[in-house]
Amino acid sequence: MKLLNYALVYRRFLLVVFTILVFLPLPLIIRTKEAQCAYILFVIAIFWITEALPLSITALLPGLMFPMFGIMRSSQVASAYFKDFHLLLIGVICLATSIEKWNLHKRIALRMVMMVGVNPAWLTLGFMSSTAFLSMWLSNTSTAAMVMPIVEAVAQQIISAEAEAEATQMTYFNESAAHGLDIDETVIGQETNEKKEKTKPAPGSSHDKGKVSRKMETEKNAVTGAKYRSRKDHMMCKLMCLSVAYSSTIGGLTTITGTSTNLIFSEHFNTRYPDCRCLNFGSWFLFSFPVALILLLLSWIWLQWLYLGFDFKMFKCGKTKTLKEKACAKVIKQEYEKLGPMRYQEIVTLVIFIVMALLWFSRDPGFVTGWSVLFSEYPGYVTDSTVALVAGILFFLIPAKKVTKMTSAGEIIAFDYTPLITWKEFQSFMPWDIAILVGGGFALADGCQVSGLSNWIGSKLSPLGSLPVWLIILISSLIVTSLTEVASNPATITILFPILSPLAEAIQVNPLQILLPSTLCTSFAFLLPVANPPNAIVFSYGHLKVIDMVKAGLGVNILGVAVVMLGMFTWIEPMFNLHEYPSWASNFVNQTMP
């Protein structure tokens, strides 16, 4: 028993040693570069999945192991750790820092909820819409962390409003009973006594049933706990929590910068296929926005049905509000009024945000000529990261308040220059662990390419070409969706990209046809609290059990894969000419052939 306790305490250390030793015969027996790289890939993949070491520390292992096995020089590996992705990430984090510092995100969320209304069904959709919109530009984690306190306050206010409404109704009922119609006993005389005898409640009558129902209600309150008056209140809290968790993830699908998974895929893809210039901010938004919108609406309906039942009365849009809805609207309005009028800092941040989004969309939209033609002498030199860096630098240049202080007479008495954000504030928001993790993924992909492991995997997967393309896409999507529940999303896409790309090349299918659905499905971590940070944040509020998230998440996972499959064979296929094997993929295969 003592030995088992020691094993549990040192389980991470034992797992690291065990993994290294178990796969060690592979490079010792099969002395090829492919086998040596496969050994490194297996070790890193297991460390990422189990998190035996921190993800960012595991991401540094290629810098240690590739030179030791003679696959890549140390200087070559080091150059893979900083790419165009990191410049884009820096610019986006500058924007996110300013948005959160000046509370612009809270103003946007509350305003969107106020626009939608406070009817329970529409309120949930309002929270989901605002959360998804914010998640397009901020990290999923920070979005969920910001919206959840508002949702919690609204939920508690709804519960207290219902209690107040019931208390009011009960008071009114008691007063009505006490001041009922006066009956002239002299007129009805003996009939009154006869009626009393006739109306004496019998066992099982409605009077007894009322007592039983009140007793059951009391027991129900005891079961559901002091926080909830009834099971319905508990279900409503679960619904709101899950709606925030899932919508923060769904919103991140919409833009390249919405989640680290999209950024990692974009950089990997552009590095592997530099001749393909079809993926940019605008094209990504055009194909992914319908996917996210459909999935958001279906998830809303699914969660409504699962926790509150599906009743068309819930979707009414009448002007008459119940006491509960009025209380809910009051809370949201009070939260919004606390922010005060829109400040100078919020306006500047909003303007930079809008300009940056417009520049991203218009750089090279595809259906019209973008502003990138201004740099036609250097095609491909200007990317989305260029826009992000320009915007990011502006946050360090534009002052957050008036530069000078004056007396009432108009004399300048002091100069005070503070930018919208400072370097320390930026550092506190910058996800350095993700930056290192992505760099490790790039280094791992380069090692697989240099060693020939990617080509070897592709040759072994070529028999899958006999299967229908839709079945290959479905299988890969289901595998990714399952794996991302137990491994982090960035680790999942980093591990699978070097496998799925050679698969597409081997069976002569447009790589985007397999990689796009797999990338979207990598974000479908809806089942477990540990699957992604937004799930963990909403789980920490204590309204949910693991089984609640599993039941709801399973339905959203199925809906997600179905919507992605629908999109791949409808609007996405003509956008990227997925039915043709592109020349840029052929060029890559020819370049890597010995």
From Swiss-Prot:
Instruction: Provide the residue span(s) of the region labelled Disordered.
Output: 192-226
Give membrane topology per the record.
Answer: Multi-pass membrane protein
Give the location in the cell: Apical cell membrane
InterPro entries tied to this protein: Na/sul_symport_CS, SLC13A/DASS
The GO terms describing molecular function are: monoatomic anion:sodium symporter activity; secondary active sulfate transmembrane transporter activity; sodium:sulfate symporter activity
State the reactions this protein catalyses.
sulfate(out) + 3 Na(+)(out) = sulfate(in) + 3 Na(+)(in); selenate(out) + 3 Na(+)(out) = selenate(in) + 3 Na(+)(in); thiosulfate(out) + 3 Na(+)(out) = thiosulfate(in) + 3 Na(+)(in)
Regions annotated as coiled coil:
none
Compositional bias ranges of the Basic and acidic residues kind: 192-220
| Top-level division of the source organism's lineage | Eukaryota
Question: Which controlled-vocabulary keywords does the entry list?
Answer: Cell membrane, Glycoprotein, Ion transport, Membrane, Sodium, Sodium transport, Sulfate transport, Symport, Transmembrane, Transmembrane helix, Transport
Q: Which GO terms describe its cellular component?
A: apical plasma membrane; plasma membrane
Per the UniProt entry, the glycosylated residues are 174, 590
Q: Name the GO terms of the biological process aspect.
A: sulfate transmembrane transport
List membrane-spanning regions: 13-33, 40-60, 77-97, 113-133, 134-154, 239-259, 283-303, 347-367, 380-400, 461-481, 487-507, 511-531, 552-572
| Keyword set includes Transmembrane | yes
Signal peptide residue numbers:
none
The UniProt entry's sequence similarity note says: Belongs to the SLC13A/DASS transporter (TC 2.A.47) family. NADC subfamily.
Q: What does this protein do?
A: Sodium:sulfate symporter that mediates sulfate reabsorption in the kidney and small intestine. Can also mediate the transport of selenate and thiosulfate.
Spell out the protein name for this chain. Solute carrier family 13 member 1
The species this protein was found in = Mus musculus
